From Swiss-Prot:
UniProt name for this protein: E3 ubiquitin-protein ligase siah2
Taxonomic lineage from the root: Eukaryota, Metazoa, Chordata, Craniata, Vertebrata
Family matches, as CDD domains: Sina
Cellular localization per UniProt: Cytoplasm
One Gene Ontology molecular-function label: zinc ion binding
Metabolic or biological pathway: Protein modification; protein ubiquitination
Keyword Transferase: yes
Species, as recorded: Xenopus laevis (African clawed frog)
Family named by the database record: Belongs to the SINA (Seven in absentia) family.
Assembly mode: Homodimer.
SIAH-type zinc finger segments: 122-182
Length: 313
């Protein structure tokens, strides 16, 4: 059983008399107006901050606009390649093109634009999900990793399996589930019983149910799959139809109970942004094999007691 802990170190305030810091040096622009230098000249230093929150200055916005890809309008990031006339296109779009989208010149041979790469190292780029609410601007080396986990990226359908390709905003997830996955039932209350029927069905099977409490919807998922060859296992987990930050406010408890036996798991629910695949891969959920399932099952039906609670601040 794994119980998450919300305790952490307390912040302390400095006390006593402190020395006054020396006056700051005269203000210098954060970006050079021009780039010059002969052979062997080094690139301008990268900004010390890897990310900032909030709008960029007008000058900075004009500079980042020079890196816009004319095809997808995302930013052209290092390694930066140009056409024979000097026009830029991002690496993702370049792989699909045979000629420059701006001047129709050939994109081969590949010509590296080292000057723009040096400028890119001194610029912070807005997250690609800025239009949906993200206010972060990041160094180009940090941008892809952030965008993979950005809270403002589109939500995928949280149902197990890859058959549904729907994507949309968090506000539209429940509407999608209601209209496109009508077989999913919803129970209300903090304590419910998740009944999985016919657990002896062969092959990979999943069971899904919704639980509504604390003004939120939680998705209960039970999957049976052969994670290791010849060894079928069950994986049970709870997802919040919400953000990671919202999920941290709750805890869930899964319990198998019967025949004077008890098996429990307690954890923080995952956001549907994270999905169930990573949790199953890392066994970060309630895991039991078919032999244990049969100890708690009744005529091929398995009841899992599910309790949702709020975490103390």
């Amino acid at each position: 059983m794994s119980r998450p802990s919300s305790a952490g170190p307390c912040a302390s305030k400095p006390c006593g008399k402190q020395k006054q810091p020396p006056p700051p040096p005269p203000h210098a622009p954060s970006l050079p107006a021009t780039i010059s230098g002969g052979p062997g000249a080094s690139a301008p230093p990268a900004p010390t901050a890897a990310a900032i929150t909030g709008p960029l200055s007008q000058q900075h916005q004009e500079l980042t606009s020079l890196f816009e890809c004319p095809v997808c309008f995302d930013y052209v990031l290092p390694p930066i390649l140009q056409c024979q006339a000097g026009h830029l296109v991002c690496n993702q779009c370049r792989q699909k093109l045979s000629c420059c989208p701006t001047c129709r010149a050939s994109l081969t041979p590949s010509i590296r634009n080292l000057a723009m790469e040096k400028v890119a190292s001194a610029v912070l780029f807005p997250c690609k999900y800025a239009s949906t609410g993200c206010s972060l601007s990041l160094h180009h080396t940090e941008k892809p990793e952030h965008e993979d986990i950005c809270e403002y990226r589109p939500y995928s359908c949280p149902c197990p399996g890859a058959s549904c390709k729907w994507q949309g905003s968090l506000e539209n997830v429940m509407q999608h589930l209601t209209h496109s996955h009508k077989s999913i039932t919803t129970l209300q209350g903090e304590d419910i019983v998740f009944l999985a029927t016919d657990i002896n069905l062969p092959g990979a099977v999943d069971w899904v149910m919704m639980q509504y409490c604390f003004n939120h919807h939680f998705m209960l998922v039970l999957e049976k799959q052969e994670k290791y060859e010849g060894h079928q296992q069950f994986f049970a987990i709870v997802l919040l139809i919400g953000t990671r930050k919202q999920a941290e406010n709750y805890a869930y408890r899964l319990e198998l109970n019967g025949n004077r036996r008890r098996l429990t798991w307690e954890a923080t629910p995952r956001s549907i942004h994270d999905g169930v695949a990573a949790a199953i891969m890392n066994s970060d959920c309630l895991v039991f094999d078919t032999a244990i399932a049969h100890l708690f099952a009744d005529n091929g039906n398995l009841g899992i007691n599910v309790t949702i609670s709020t975490c103390c601040p």
